[in-house]
């Protein structure tokens, strides 16, 4: 759509960006699905960090909306969708805020590890609003072993794969985008 006064396009995303967002979202969804048989081991956190570093906050935020909406279509509506619509953008904003301050993969691995470690707590807060404080507390305490696994797997995954994936996607984005 053209702006009548300036003659410039007023679209939010170009066609190339929409295709990119679709491909990145599909990669997230399929990556999560492939690893779903292993409790709390996932590549979604890694990919959101890499997408933010390579493609920027704006595109990564749109990917998070598409990914979460796709997850709802797969798994149905529940209280978890509130957390997904909040936490993935928060991870993107944190990554974006620290992208110039953190140069090595260790800093990003710590962010990913802490994110995984606190993931269940955020769900417990939302569950408390719907089912009561005691339910939320039990939900969180029973999930602590899974949160520890989630944090450790996020740390290791980002530590090992962030740099090569960032390098690869940066090179591909220069060639195709």
Segments the model singles out, each with a brief description of its role:
Residues 2-8, 17-24, 63, 83-128:
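Short helix-perturbing small/polar motifs within transmembrane alpha-helices
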Residues 2-50, 58-62:
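Hydrophobic transmembrane alpha-helices
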Residues 29-41, 66-99, 131:
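Interfacial aromatic-anchored transmembrane helix boundaries in multi-pass membrane proteins
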Residues 46-49, 72, 92, 120, ...:
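Hydrophobic transmembrane alpha-helices of multi-pass small-molecule transporters
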Residues 51-57, 70-75:
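Interfacial segments of multi-pass membrane proteins
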Residues 81, 104-177:
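Membrane-embedded alpha-helical hairpins and interfacial helices in multi-pass inner-membrane proteins
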Residues 53-56, 94-102, 163-170:
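Structural signal for the C-terminal ends of transmembrane alpha-helices
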């Amino acid at each position: 759509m053209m702006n009548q006064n300036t003659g410039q396009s007023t679209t939010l995303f170009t066609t190339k960006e929409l295709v990119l967002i679709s491909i990145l979202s599909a990669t997230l969804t399929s990556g999560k699905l492939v690893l779903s048989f292993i409790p709390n081991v996932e590549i979604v956190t890694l990919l959101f960090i890499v997408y933010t570093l390579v493609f920027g906050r704006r595109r990564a935020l749109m990917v998070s909306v598409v990914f979460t909406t796709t997850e709802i279509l797969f798994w149905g509506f529940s209280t978890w969708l509130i957390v997904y619509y909040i936490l993935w953008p928060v991870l993107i904003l944190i990554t974006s805020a620290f992208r110039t301050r953190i140069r090595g993969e260790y800093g990003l691995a710590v962010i990913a590890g802490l994110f995984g470690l606190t993931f269940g707590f955020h769900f417990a807060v939302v569950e408390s609003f719907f089912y009561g404080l005691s339910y939320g507390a039990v939900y969180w305490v029973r999930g602590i072993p899974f949160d520890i696994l989630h944090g450790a797997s996020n740390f290791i995954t980002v530590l090992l794969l962030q740099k090569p994936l960032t390098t690869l996607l940066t090179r591909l984005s220069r060639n195709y985008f």
